[in-house]
Amino acid sequence: MIMAVLMMLCPDIYASAKKAEESPAVQVLTSSKNARKLEGGMLKLARPALKKTPMAVVMDDIDMMVMYSISQKADEEEKQFAQQAINVLEKYNKVSEIDDPDYRMSIYIDNPVGENFSEIILYISRPDPSIMVFVGNFTIGSLKKVGEISDQRRMERRQAKR
């Protein structure tokens, strides 16, 4: 229901799950500069009632904090799927320190409770966890693609420094 409303309100900004790989929102995951630029135009969701259990905190070498969590309402199968997605994201993110909290963004994995376990919904939260910005819904496959793009950019930056 929430997804349907979001897609109706913002059809030009948010791609459907089928087009997640081509979505501009995917790039938000690899560049916090883009995320800051897009934040003003994204739909902010007040979700103070969300009860989530933090699973891992990882920071990449740009300046984005990534916090993964799984809904407490998720059953075992859903938790396993969400954990798979977390593992994919962790593989492509390195831990680093950021002093300025204004540049920190949390990305929540919200595995929807229901029949479809093949996609997850991502939100960016900054700085108040009760106010989230919808990014899009992705499959594990598209997250792998995002990770590979991020990994490739890291290699390019390292070579440029030499």
What are these regions (language model features)?
Residues 1-22:
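Bacterial Sec-dependent N-terminal signal peptides
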Residues 15-17, 45-50, 154-162:
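Glycine- and aromatic-enriched low-complexity segments, predominantly in secreted/extracellular proteins
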Residues 19-80:
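Early exported N-terminus immediately downstream of N-terminal targeting peptides
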Residues 22, 136-162:
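C-terminal partner/receptor-binding element of secreted or periplasmic proteins
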Residues 59-64, 92, 116-118:
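A broad structural signal for short, well-ordered beta-strand segments within beta-sheet-rich domains
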Residues 64-107:
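Mature extracytoplasmic domains of secretory-pathway proteins
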Residues 108-143:
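A short, solvent-exposed beta-edge/loop patch
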